[in-house]
Amino acid sequence: MLRESTAVLYTSTVRDGAMAELSFHLGMLTPLPVKQMVLHGLQIETKKTIRIGRKDFLALGIDDNRFAEIAYDRAQLIGDAAAFLGYDGILVPSARWTCENLVVICDNHDISLPIDLVSSEDVDWQAWARAHGFITTP
């Protein structure tokens, strides 16, 4: 997180989207983490959410060809602007799976609205990552 930037809860709207994010980031580590992970299912309600699609990228200064790279500065600035405008959520395309991710802007999220844990699942992230091409090591 950039200094003075907005705190967010980064989620995926589908299980495989969350697994893809987890696998992408953990797959960059050496050695690969061997500990089993826990995937949590949440029920989240927001009041004022904006949807940003790939069609909006050019106007927002996001290079669609480099979207999957780890270059978060522009996305964080857009998140900061959404927070300033009073949004409590942003729906964005996943860079790693065909789904949307919900970014909850913590400071703007009404504490009376639910962010409820509805499920927890132990996952073998390495097996999932291998099966979906995120890691290739045996």
Show which residues each predicted segment covers.
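Extended catalytic/binding region for NAD+/ADP-ribose chemistry, centered on the ART fold
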Residues: 1-29
